[in-house]
Amino acid sequence: MASTKISTDYLIVGSGAVGMAFADTLLTDTDADIVIVDRHHKPGGHWNVAYPFVTLHQPSSFYGVSSRELSTGKLDEIGLNKGLGSLASGATVSAYFDSVMRERFLPSGRVRYFPMSEYYGEGRFTSLVSGKEFEVTARLKHVDATYLKTTVPSTHIPRFSIGDDVWFMPINDLPKLTSTPEGFVVIGGGKTGIDACLWLLENGVEPDAIRWIMPRDAWMIDRRNTQSDIAFFNDTIGAQAAQFEAIANATSIDDLFERLEDSGVLLRLDPAVKPRMFHGATITQAELNELRRIQSVIRMGRVEKIEADQITLEGGTIPTGPNIVHVDCSASAITNLHTKPIFQGDLITPQTVRSYQPVFSASLIAHVEATRETEQEKNQLCGVVPLPNLDTDWITMMIPFMMNQYQWSRDPELREWLSHNRLDGFSGMVRNIDKNDEEKQAILQRMRDSAMPAMAKLQTFVSELEKAS
């Protein structure tokens, strides 16, 4: 079958959140023609196969694409997120991206979208439905919006063996239960494991009926400190100031994490257990209190094998039974932790340029692509902030994060753009405070006073980590 030849300015591979945020800003800032290729049947990437009760872990007010609001603008009035900015459900997010494609991208006449297509590289892809083959020539750039390689429970293959008589399911299948199990074993200590435990508790499962296998405890972020509404200025920007002060005053790495916890920047499940993981999960104090009701937290390493009567872990075995549901939450949300320059010749590889903010990062990268000339300048403004995994990655992540913020603050055009980009969430908050508001100005002064000492201390700690590795 002969290939259909297509010519465009930008070929974007992936219509997940990153690809959509990048394309949206490119549409706003340029007159470019865009081709988007994705293997899913509609935009949204992993949201197409997310578990039914998933929600955002961050406020809806700064998720999605820059040109269209996702948030209702209201605070949640019930539930464990009560009093904070609403968290869009998975269904809402999926519908949002679909409407962005149908109501903004395609009507522009500058976007051609090829869903249900397998991309092979070098501009070649095939429709999984019709079998038609296509070859795309990108006049300007290829954009790999799949580089972060998001994985989800429904498509994840566990790294442990499972016996034939084991009642085992991904988190997606929990709402499909038709009979009451004797108990539940939740496998995985990350965001998905948290969601599974909270869902079970919300649906009336007694805490004693839940065992939570947690290979590593995690540091978590208080969601109250991530709100973009000016009413939360003292929490959000105050946490930034407290963070810089904790770094600057820390006498050791252990002391740093103690200070971060004491100041409310970081949270942990059990005060007696030192976390060894940091993935940037956000949580409310109410959610944390709910999770602490679960007393049977298994800290014996990763699961190696599940049989009908026992679970084998790295550190030993625990009993189980055929009437106990084993819920797989062991998939890592993002599996590619390696970094590379974002701008390389005719290839753009979106990665995070602000800690755990991939959609904001994609939007900023697109704006820099549209408004800057040289590759050197583009990469200088878009230093990669590595995705964290270990607890100490919080430290190594902070240096490029602070460097990027410094670079952006010195660029008047970029400062203006940031203050009007809904995905930023925070620049506008800072810019719009009253100069006569002494309380808020004092918080900003704390940040300014601590920034340089904090950067110096971070570099000291990074040197210690490098020597120890």
Language model: regions and residue ranges:
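C-terminal catalytic lobe of FAD-dependent flavoproteins
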Residues: S263-G264, R268-T339, V430-S469
